[in-house]
Amino acid sequence: MDIVLEICDYYLFDKVYADVFPKDGAVHEFLKPAIQSFSQIDFPSLPNLDSFDTNSTLISSNNFNISNVNPATIPSYLFSKIASYQDKSEIYGLAPKFFPATDFINTSFLARSNIFRETLSLFIITTIFGWLLYFIVAYLSYVFVFDKKIFNHPRYLKNQMSLEIKRATTAIPVMVLLTIPFFLLELNGYSFLYLDINECTGGYKAILWQIPKFILFTDCGIYFLHRWLHWPSVYKVLHKPHHKWIVCTPFASHAFHPVDGFFQSLPYHLYPLLFPLHKVLYLFLFTFVNFWTVMIHDGSYWSNDPVVNGTACHTVHHLYFNYNYGQFTTLWDRLGNSYRRPDDSLFVKDAKAEEEKKIWKEQTRKMEEIRGEVEGKVDDREYVEQ
């Protein structure tokens, strides 16, 4: 995110923050006492790990005894442990990296590296980008890919598309707010994101390998999180809003409860905290993930690939609830005994109206049996065909 943030700071935010939050301006004068009080707090220093006598003060690796633990040293030890993972050369805002300094870079009391400014900037950028990506990709999918015969499906809801859009547009800012801490960690050097491509970083070969590793890691993480979201107590509170859509349009892709969306995004944010990932590839993969999320909700069934968890597989998940939890592949569903092969009827092209009604009727019958087991007898959805 440092690339995106510096672009925005260079072309827009430096001047905006200088105008709205200038040094010695009214806002700065009002906040000065609070800033000074905060700066005078005596925070514990972060000691050098090498200075710890772990045998006597914390934990003896050879002869662990709870009596050897000195509680007073634990916070400092944890702080130092965390600090040891920080790459100070990757802290954002201390000096420009990609563009020259602007005339406004030092004229706001909120410097580029200020955590409050970073939080506000990230919220604005990611929310707007999230909305734009959602509407552009979903609209293009709706116009050029989406099978509009789904509007006649007996389990299509009244005003469904407007409900999907309302749910998504209100959820995206909250999901962004919940994920900002991960972006802040990245901006402050607590990740394995890198930019230089050389022998030390593995060159272009390493970047090519990062794509399947990212897909496999996140696919695994989402599978288990998705299964957890289907636990009855969790499903009822968090995941049921997304399963309101039995048959989907592309606009259902981001129509989540925001906490549900946050949990399902965790693997994407955890990956660069655990494994090396090129910064440009990181931005590409995050964009790709949003494309993919729209694509698997577009109701157009072109592939019945046994490996790829495509639109047909995800349609089965929305219709029959307890199957196909994976995001990109069918691997974990097969290992977890939750894979359900899409019905052949999904791939019938140019079916006659009567034949299509029979297919939908059979889908509805199977769906209602499973829905009753998952949600109970009462169905609060309002369908077009009641």
Curated annotation (Swiss-Prot):
The chain crosses the membrane at residues 120-140, 172-192, 206-226, 272-292. A motif (Histidine box-1) lies at residues 226-230. Changing V237A: In strain: azole-resistant isolates. The lineage of its organism: Eukaryota, Fungi, Dikarya, Ascomycota, Saccharomycotina. It is an enzyme of class 1 (oxidoreductase). The third module or late pathway involves the ergosterol synthesis itself through consecutive reactions that mainly occur in the endoplasmic reticulum (ER) membrane. Firstly, the squalene synthase ERG9 catalyzes the condensation of 2 farnesyl pyrophosphate moieties to form squalene, which is the precursor of all steroids. One of its GO terms (cellular component) is membrane. Residues 214-337 form the Fatty acid hydroxylase domain. GO terms for molecular function: C-5 sterol desaturase activity; iron ion binding. One of its GO terms (biological process) is ergosterol biosynthetic process. It catalyses: a Delta(7)-sterol + 2 Fe(II)-[cytochrome b5] + O2 + 2 H(+) = a Delta(5),Delta(7)-sterol + 2 Fe(III)-[cytochrome b5] + 2 H2O. Its EC number is 1.14.19.20. The histidine box domains may contain the active site and/or be involved in metal ion binding. It comes from Candida albicans (strain SC5314 / ATCC MYA-2876) (Yeast). Pathway: Steroid metabolism; ergosterol biosynthesis; ergosterol from zymosterol: step 3/5. This is Delta(7)-sterol 5(6)-desaturase ERG3.
